[in-house]
Amino acid sequence: MNFCRFSYIRIAIVLCLCSVAWQVQSRDYVKVVDGDSLEIGRRRIRLLGIDAPEYRQFCFDAQKQKYECGKESRAYLDKMLKKARYKVDCRTQKTDIYKRELAECFIGKTNLNLEMLKAGWAVVYRSDDEAYLRAEKKARKQQKGIWQGKFLRPEYYRRLNRR
């Protein structure tokens, strides 16, 4: 009887350790897809309430020079995650029609969604969150990121460039 109880305890411990190991691995593997999308393990995550330029999208700076704003936006998000050694906590609120998790993602207490807006590398998307709206307005006023010149809002760019 003691042997059976001991075996069940060992099995329970092994199962717990396996699940913890899987969580650590999936949190360690983070891929920045573009300025508003991540892959964490097998999870596809879209940053909720923001819309960043598409990876192949171009914008125009203050001197009317064309630049790769989609790549710049992605690089900015990647830089923030790299500083945090890709340790990110994404809090899923819902799932979209493409089966991506719509989430607010954090590095510690720093909200990545909000930081992308503050830096000017994203626009508010279908959100009435006051902090998000203020951050976008401030970035626009300070001509940060995509607000330094002219750009097509990402949702319009996608409509014009459907495959």
List PLM regions with ranges.
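Small beta-barrel nucleic-acid-binding modules, primarily SNase/OB-fold domains
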Residues: N2-R163
